[in-house]
């Protein structure tokens, strides 16, 4: 029993090292607050550890982690709409991290992303993380056949809001804005 717990714990730690930063960047896009994103990551990997302990399937760990993170973020956002969170006064004095943005495109992209509906943010963030349409469908709780159409609409709305051309820059900016120092 003790040996299997160590093996399970090490497997969870290995997956955290492999996917933790990407899950965090994804969570920041969805919950829009770094502390909440950290909570989503912690909740996701705790569930993953329990999943491993229960002998759960590990054939698509990355997809599983992003699906659980999406659900945790959605649950957190629902709770947030019911309760106004208390933030200590010193939180308001800490400025958000500043990323290099010489021509304002990054700020424009970030602002446009924040204004999008939750499902659009979710779809864009999942795609930016490289998940398959099947995994995106599972995480977003939509039919796999609908992913392409809904994702295209989300990209169109985001690009219309930012004025960014459809030449791949959109996804690059989405990934760059997600976490300071990422890429």
Predicted regions and their residues:
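Arg/Lys-rich amphipathic alpha helix in sigma70-family domain 2
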Residues: 53-56, 67-88, 102
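DNA-recognition helix of helix-turn-helix
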Residues: 70, 140-168
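Internal acidic/polar
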Residues: 83-106, 132, 173-179
């Amino acid at each position: 029993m003790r040996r299997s717990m160590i093996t399970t714990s090490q497997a969870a730690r290995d997956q955290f090292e492999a996917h933790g930063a990407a899950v965090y960047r994804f969570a920041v896009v969805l919950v829009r607050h770094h502390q909440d994103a950290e909570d989503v990551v912690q909740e996701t990997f705790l569930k993953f550890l329990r999943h491993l302990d229960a002998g759960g399937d590990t054939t698509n760990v990355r997809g599983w982690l992003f699906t659980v993170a999406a659900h945790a973020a959605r649950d957190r956002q629902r709770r947030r709409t019911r309760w106004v969170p208390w933030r200590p006064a010193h939180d308001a004095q800490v400025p958000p991290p500043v990323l290099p943005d010489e021509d304002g495109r990054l700020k424009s992209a970030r602002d446009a992303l924040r204004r999008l509906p939750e499902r659009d943010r979710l779809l864009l963030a999942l795609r930016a993380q490289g998940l398959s349409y099947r995994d995106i469908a599972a995480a977003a709780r939509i039919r796999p056949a609908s992913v392409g159409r809904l994702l295209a609409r989300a990209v169109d709305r985001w690009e219309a809001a930012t004025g960014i051309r459809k030449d791949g820059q959109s996804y690059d900016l989405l990934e760059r804005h997600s976490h300071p120092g990422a890429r």
